[in-house]
Amino acid sequence: MKFLRNLILSFVFAGAMSMTTSANADCKVHLGDFDWDSANIHTAIAGYIIEKGYGCEVESTKGSTTPIMAALFDQQIDIITEVWRDNLVQLIEDNLAKGTIVELGVNTPSSTQGFYVDKPTADKYGLKSVEDMKKPEIAKLFADPEAPGKGRMTSCISGWTCYTINLVKHKVYGLDKFYTNFDPGSGGALDAAIAGGFK
């Protein structure tokens, strides 16, 4: 673990990696990877640099947010290269305060989460807020073929923290009376659903 302290690679917040020039050929680094594309890319790049540039043995474990973050906090995983802080604010703040993890930087500062509607539809129907989505005639525009009488809001994948956040928001905003919180099942299916909305 001395190597990890030298590199200061305990926790990479939202992706940016920061390394010193220290190297150790007898090191092992355990990376945590997630089940979405940008995290996979960042983890692969970090693994390549650590292995080829520093001569370390690299192990990578892939999973959903909850188990990977738990393993990071328990120090079973050394590095993650991306995390959505808004989804885990208290856990991250607590572990930063305890010194369990170290924040090194940000690589995607403009990343945001929320409910989105394509601009042509929003402009045509005057959609400006969540309240507008609760009109029955608007919900019909997004009909869920598996839930007659309700619209479909394509959510995050079950296992991602944002899925639970969206589920709570549906109930708090009263959207659950009009829409399903649809789990697309995979990152690829989520991408396809978003792209399909513009056809």
Regions found by a protein language model. Name each.
Residues 46-54, 132, 140-180:
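Ligand-binding cleft/hinge of the Venus flytrap
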Residues 43, 63-99, 189, 193-197:
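Pocket-flanking alpha-helical
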Residues 7-18:
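Bacterial N-terminal signal peptides
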Residues 71, 78-81, 154-199:
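Ligand-binding pocket segment of bilobal, Venus flytrap-like solute-binding proteins
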Residues 1-6:
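Positively charged n-region of N-terminal signal peptides that target proteins for export
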Residues 100-155:
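A conserved helix-loop-strand patch within extracytoplasmic ligand-binding domains
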Residues 20-22:
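N-terminal signal peptide c-region/cleavage motif recognized by signal peptidases
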Residues 25-38, 56-61, 149-154:
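Short, well-ordered beta-strand elements
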